[in-house]
Amino acid sequence: MISANEFAKSTVLMSTSLPGIAGIFIAVPYFRLRPRWLTVVSLGIISLFFFDAALKGFLRDYFGLRPNPTLVLHAIFNTNPDETNEFFLHNWRKLAEAGGILLFVGAWIFWFEKCMSFREARLPLNTLRRSGFASIGVLLTAFLALHFNPTMAKENPALFWPIRYMDYRNQLKQAQELRQTVARNMAQRSEWKVQYTGPANNTVVWIIGESTNRSNMSLYGYGRRTTPMLDALRNQLIVFQDVISSEPATMSSLMKMFTPADLVSPDAWNSKPDVLMLAEEAGYKTFWISNQVPNDGWLGLVSERADEKLFINKGAGRGENNFDGNLLPGLEAALANPASKKLIVVHLLGAHPTYDMRYPSSYAKFNDVDDAIAEQLSAAGRSIWIRQLRNEYDNAIAYNDFVVASMIKSTMASAPGAASLLFSADHGQEVGHTRDHAGQSVADPSGYEIPMLLWTRSFSGKSAVDKAILENRPYQTDHLEHTIMGLLKVESRYYSSSRDIMSDAFVSEDFSNGLRRINGRPYLPRTVTFNQPLAKAGS
């Protein structure tokens, strides 16, 4: 719901503006009988404030914070009509509840306004004139004076949303300026100090998952067998146990995964080269294979730099039933490319809501099951709606298991030589893990706790102890570009081995002692089994 602070600011603004503006016309004799347009204006002002409060409240409930930060702006404005339609499909119950309450309040306001109109019509004219002007002047003066306070001025709904949209457009403008800046600075690439230190042939596949929570994978101990294919490959994989995303939303997370930007310097993506640029400078042929529609913002700038691009999703973006398995031929073609050094980025739709659109019907394995997970959710007081979404989410995880495992097998079967495949998700997902909610979550650890796993030929033959040490290193993905550059064997002024999770020089202590943060607070790994929902409050 809307915060007390926001509610107080909106109430003050509405309390001073509405009576002041509407009261002018009540007090003036000419408007003794209120005209219809004045009623429309009065109701419009009231509706604007209440709709603004309702929208902010919904966004706070959905994202866990008010719609100021970059991640919410991207989620609101960086979308297309079909993705918007999918959002409504996924959240129609909550939206229906909010809409019903808003309609009820609106009807009550309309009735109250009519009652006030009849009451005013019966009051003596002189009473209106004498008592009206002074109070109206005070209210209007207070309303205007409040706008000298920048914080209060920005809470005016007539300004709040236009300002937010202008902020978003400015970010897009910065991205366009970045393209121009990069073009101008081509001659300055020597300052990057790029050096390739690897073998003659090297292939790195980077699979980027979407909205994937590791606590829903049997590979990480989940009570449902959602990842049987990855489970079978377990001995050949390095499965990192304590990795979190830097952000709970796609765009802001990817900005920090692909560039030197991190939680300390979030704007570094504006001025420093991304992974693809550094790889190409080192002589790599780059591929971008995606089941997400081409992006016209920052991510579009990155993907368009790839030497070869394949976007199989030509329809409704995240609202398209185009399954990630359809990316496999594109990956196999890239693996067969004769280039000696290849970086192949594969961007999945993963488990992004709407969950039941992420898998074919043959993977609807957990629909209506009555198992220990269902009992845990029920005991924790999760609604039947959330329990159903958890089943659909687990189906999506099961299909994601097939996709990722198949890509690992394809990479394993590729031409001999150095080869690695890293799978990491952009962010997690809350699906009844800690509360009765399904979707992105800024405040809950479930929005950040992601899987990360690696297959690499260079690690074969290492001891179980070495593997266990690696798997238990704490990490956050705003430093993931260092690990990618390590796999690529590319050194530069932007690479730090202390942030490369595979490096012998990796400094675990930094990540254990406050470097990792979620929602502005230090992240503390949970000491309870994180794949079980919390108990009911008071139980």
Protein language model regions, located:
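Residue-level marker for buried hydrophobic side chains located in beta-strands
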Residues: 207, 421-423
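Active-site glycine-centered loops adjacent to acidic/histidine catalytic or metal-binding residues
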Residues: 426
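Transmembrane and membrane-interface helices of multi-pass
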Residues: 1-160
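A long, amphipathic alpha-helix that forms part
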Residues: 329-332, 370-421, 454, 479
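Active-site-proximal alpha/beta segments of enzymes that process anionic O-linked groups
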Residues: 138-206, 211-375, 449, 477, ...
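Short, P/G- and charge-enriched loop/turn segments at secondary-structure junctions
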Residues: 192-195, 436-443
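Acyl/amide activation-and-transfer machinery of modular secondary-metabolite enzymes
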Residues: 446-453
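Membrane-interface soluble catalytic domains
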Residues: 7, 11, 30-33, 113-118, ...
